[in-house]
Amino acid sequence: MNLRPHQQRIINKMNQTPKGQVIVPTGGGKTMCMITDAQRQFVEGYNTIVVVAPRILLAQQLSNDFLKIIDNVKVMHVHSGETKHYSTTKPNDIGNWFCKNQLFGENGLIFTTYHSLHKIQQSGIPVNTIYFDEAHNSVQQHFHTATRFFATTNNRRCSSLLLLLIIAIMMKEV
């Protein structure tokens, strides 16, 4: 996969830093940076990665984008929308899905929304990496507990929080 120079710099920095923000204008390739980072982690060993989106439709779109490139992964959606992938909002089912993946040494990729992120928290599963797309949505009061939990949890690379911001104002500066 060929990355543009600014995307390669982002990936290099992500490999060096456990937490950070990627601020790139709309259409600048933030999703490709997430996918490239996730792909590297999956090659390195078993991982559970969570992708958080503000809306169900965006979670589904991100899932489609990831799965065009990453195919050796078990996928789950944690939101109330319909999807062709396994989907639940029940913490026990999330935990069972994780345990099954762990038993068989499978990488796991979970797509969720800010509204449902607390269900993953309640499941108690360890998360290696979490990507917050449109992270400005995470500051809403009823999302804050779950986002803070994942930002401060010390599971292997769970603390490697990548905050992805889509800032339309930056388009004017570019």
Predicted regions and their residues:
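N-terminal pre-P-loop "Q-motif" helix
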Residues: 1-18
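Pre-Walker A (Motif I) flank of P-loop NTPase domains
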Residues: 16-22, 47, 108
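Walker A/P-loop
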Residues: 17-37
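Conserved Walker A/P-loop ATP-binding site and its immediately adjacent core
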Residues: 31-36, 42-68, 169
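Conserved helix-turn-beta segment of the N-terminal RecA-like "Helicase ATP-binding" lobe
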Residues: 57-91
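Conserved two-lobed SF2 helicase motor
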Residues: 102-120
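SF2 helicase catalytic motif II
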Residues: 114-117, 122-160, 165-170
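A short helix-turn-beta junction within AAA+ P-loop NTPase domains corresponding to the substrate/partner-engaging
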Residues: 173-174
